[in-house]
Amino acid sequence: MRRLDDVLAELRVDRVDFIKLDVEGAELSFLRGATSVLNGKSRPAILADVQDLRTEPWGYPAREIIKFLSQAAYRWFALGAKGSLEPVSTDLAAYDANLVALPEERITEFQKMLEAPRSSL
């Protein structure tokens, strides 16, 4: 397995805006291999599948994903009705949801994007 930081360096990618994280329980391993991205100047939003059912076979509870990104100054949200961001508690006993983790400094930016009028198709 290769670390995201190593792959991005090899490909000379200097900016990642969004990560969809669904690796069937290996989320924490993935995040540990992405510390340069998570702590860089342009930190990505993350949509993560956070489920104890998936993480327990890997030997950790899903709340460790929550804790890891919270310690990196990310805040957790569920997407509510009409795309609103609903804060999620970081101290629940168990998790089973797709959640959004946003860097603290980009929360307002994402709220504005979600509130922007959508063009009709």
Task: Give the label of every model feature segment.
Residues 1-41, 54-60, 64, 120:
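Short internal loop-to-helix segment that lines adenine-nucleotide cofactor pockets
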Residues 60-121:
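Binuclear metal-ion centers of metallo-dependent hydrolases, dominated by the metallo-beta-lactamase
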Residues 43-45:
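Short glycine-centered segments of the SAM/dcSAM-binding site in methyltransferase folds
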Residues 51-53, 82:
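Active-site beta-loop-alpha junctions enriched in small/polar residues
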Residues 17-20, 47-49, 100-102:
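Short beta-strand segments
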